[in-house]
Amino acid sequence: MIETLLPASALAFPAIDPVIFRIGPLAVHWYGLGYVVGILFAWWYGKKLLRSHRLWANNQPPMAPEALDDFVIWAALGVVLGGRIGYVLFYNFSYYISNPLAIPALWDGGMSFHGGILGTTLAMILFARSRGILVWSMFDTIAAGVPIGLGVVRVANFINSELWGRVSDVPWAVYFPNGGPLPRHPSQLYEAFLEGLVLFFVLFVLVWGARKLKQPGFVAGAFVTGYGLSRIAVEFFREPDAQIGYLFGGWLTMGMVLSVPMVLLGLWAMWRANRAAARNA
């Protein structure tokens, strides 16, 4: 019955070329641009926060704004290497263990946000320790601007017609070119809204309104918790990766499994930051 109703209520997929422009053999994709925009925005916004001395404990930023100029390369390597290795380990290990030469083929797709955040976290720890910067404040500085990049990348996922949602009869369901004959939830846009706009707004209020940068680790904890909760919510509408499917009961996905520890870790980081602030009060 639902199959007969779906076609009349769904939306056609917008004809947007995944390639923005070409220069000879070089093709610039929306997906790649999303990562560039995300890194550059986090860099710019982080420097803005560091220049606003009143946001930090004792009006003393944890580092000079110029330090982020050096961190950009570290961040890019952490995102790309962590994202790729995470995808290989979490989502398609059996394929890549049999085809190791395919691991560096980033142009064929396959990145994991959970791997990307692990790679970036490692880069932040190494960078902060090499410069004598408080690690928790380093986390806060970067985390505050990350949601914008997440939102842009999710929109790029939509343009690429990838990571689409489950079959649905909602009026805004979309016929994806490679998503089969039935319309699906545009779950990429749900993620762009929750992980991008909503999460950035929450962190913006915590930073500029509640002045939570004065409590090292709180903003980073809020980001990790917010992302984890957003991802878990959207996983109920997102089609699981074909090579994995559901892990349990027709509802549990790998995205959920990887996000639950993030929520717990983020809650712990916020609790720790509040407790430290209370002790120093």
From Swiss-Prot:
Record-linked InterPro entries: Lgt (IPR001640)
Record's keyword terms, sorted: Cell inner membrane, Cell membrane, Membrane, Transferase, Transmembrane, Transmembrane helix
Cell compartments where the protein resides: Cell inner membrane
Function recorded in the entry: Catalyzes the transfer of the diacylglyceryl group from phosphatidylglycerol to the sulfhydryl group of the N-terminal cysteine of a prolipoprotein, the first step in the formation of mature lipoproteins.
UniProt-recorded name of the protein: Phosphatidylglycerol--prolipoprotein diacylglyceryl transferase
Enzyme nomenclature, EC number: 2.5.1.145
Parts of the chain that traverse the membrane: 23-43, 71-91, 107-127, 133-153, 189-209, 217-237, 247-267
GO biological processes: lipoprotein biosynthetic process
UniProt-listed HAMAP family: Lgt
GO MF annotations in UniProt: phosphatidylglycerol-prolipoprotein diacylglyceryl transferase activity
Coiled-coil residues: none
Family: Belongs to the Lgt family.
Binding-site residues for a 1,2-diacyl-sn-glycero-3-phospho-(1'-sn-glycerol), renumbered to this chain: 154
Membrane topology value: Multi-pass membrane protein
Pathway recorded for this protein: Protein modification; lipoprotein biosynthesis (diacylglyceryl transfer)
Domain of life of the native organism: Bacteria
UniProt main location, coarse: membrane
Cellular component GO terms, alphabetical: plasma membrane
